[in-house]
Amino acid sequence: ECFCYDKKMAGFAAQEHIAEFKDGKCPVQLMVMKCDKFKGKGFDAFLMSQMWDCQEDRERIFRECKYQVVATDMLAAALPALERANLDADFLEALAELYPTCEAFYFQSCGKLFLAEDVRSHQIEGSDRFIRFGVNVRFFNIEGTEDMLIDTVGMSPLFLPALQYHFHNMAPNW
């Protein structure tokens, strides 16, 4: 249900997803901001190096894409983790349908970049969609050692912990 619409944004109440607080309940809100110019700035070499799902296209996307639409959920932190994961994945799929000429999706909470076609054509179901699109597994070489580190980023919207694995003397491409 659309509860606000103007030149700057549109807001939708997700009536099937009710956030409960100690002083009341209300539907989670899904917000879509207006289309703005995109300049591809603010993404340093480190952020881009961790965009594993779009390595071949990321530089072209940042160079050629001229517009962006920002979308977010509000009040969804009050939902159980699995419900929020499914809501956010459903929202992503709705945005992919709503913007058929969209070329890519960027997830600020985890730093992942996907071609829009990958979002539109996936066969993943349920909350696994959130893991696929909203959680990034990053790889680091620890300077001055032969150690490596793998960590995750993106579970915080669900209030779940990140994972971190530290490897000693292991070939990363086994």
What are these regions (language model features)?
Residues 32, 69, 170-174:
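Generic hydrophobic, helix-prone segments enriched in Leu/Val/Ile
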Residues 1-60:
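N-terminal low-complexity, intrinsically disordered segments
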Residues 107-174:
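Aromatic/basic-lined ligand-recognition segments
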